[in-house]
């Protein structure tokens, strides 16, 4: 199993190096992260595998999407940074005001759980509680990555059609 994962890891690294477009680079990097995490999981190194997968997918979401959108935008428009910062601040304040009472009541009414003081039980409990959140986070990041790539690719095609039709 490890030999097959190492071979596929090498193949994914070659795919990243030889990517002909940012889309294939993003896909190859996603496979590289997944295979590296599986190789670490096969060696019973659980926490770095989880962190590796989340960092790779989150980093790809930021770097590849930004570079693809920047390369695909034929006529970049300036962004009103002041309005964006004000709207973001307003959204954070609104979410904080709405969620504060619910978090406070949840923490006050929920009985505290008693843990065994053995470290193995505590680590098992942390992993058991966090595994579903990790799976949800990976699915959301992957869906977001490919949906934004799809939107950017259609935008590029639309912009090319618009520019060629005006001449």
UniProtKB/Swiss-Prot annotation:
Query: Has keyword Hydrolase?
Result: no
Q: How does it sit in the membrane?
A: Multi-pass membrane protein
The chain's coiled-coil residues are: none
The entry's localization annotation reads: Mitochondrion membrane
User: Which residues are listed as membrane-spanning?
Assistant: 21-41, 45-65, 78-98, 132-152
At the top level, the lineage of the source is Eukaryota
User: What class does this enzyme belong to in the EC scheme?
Assistant: translocase
Q: What GO molecular functions are on record for this protein? A: NADH dehydrogenase (ubiquinone) activity
Q: What is any one of the record's Gene Ontology cellular component terms? A: mitochondrion
Q: Which UniProt keywords apply?
A: Electron transport, Membrane, Mitochondrion, NAD, Respiratory chain, Translocase, Transmembrane, Transmembrane helix, Transport, Ubiquinone
EC annotation from Swiss-Prot or TrEMBL: 7.1.1.2
Could you tell me what reaction this enzyme catalyses? a ubiquinone + NADH + 5 H(+)(in) = a ubiquinol + NAD(+) + 4 H(+)(out)
The UniProt function text for this chain reads:
Core subunit of the mitochondrial membrane respiratory chain NADH dehydrogenase (Complex I) that is believed to belong to the minimal assembly required for catalysis. Complex I functions in the transfer of electrons from NADH to the respiratory chain. The immediate electron acceptor for the enzyme is believed to be ubiquinone.
Give the family, as the similarity comment puts it: Belongs to the complex I subunit 6 family.
What name does UniProt use for this protein? NADH-ubiquinone oxidoreductase chain 6
Q: Which organism is it from?
A: Branchiostoma floridae
Gene name, Swiss-Prot/TrEMBL = ND6
């Amino acid at each position: 199993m490890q030999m097959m994962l190492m071979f596929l890891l090498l193949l994914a690294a070659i795919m990243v190096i030889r990517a002909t477009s940012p889309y294939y680079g993003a896909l190859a990097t996603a496979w590289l992260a997944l295979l590296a995490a599986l190789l670490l999981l096969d060696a019973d190194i659980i926490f770095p595998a989880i962190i590796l997968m989340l960092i790779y997918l989150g980093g790809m979401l930021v770097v590849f999407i930004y570079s693809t959108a920047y390369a695909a935008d034929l006529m970049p428009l300036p962004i009103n940074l002041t309005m964006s910062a004000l709207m973001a601040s307003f959204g954070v304040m609104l979410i904080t005001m709405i969620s504060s009472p619910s978090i406070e009541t949840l923490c006050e009414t929920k009985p505290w759980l008693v843990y065994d003081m053995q470290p193995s039980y505590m680590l098992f409990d942390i992993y058991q509680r966090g595994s579903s959140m990790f799976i949800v986070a990976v699915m959301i990041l992957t869906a977001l990555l490919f949906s934004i790539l799809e939107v950017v690719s259609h935008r590029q095609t639309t912009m090319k059609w618009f520019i060629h039709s005006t001449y």
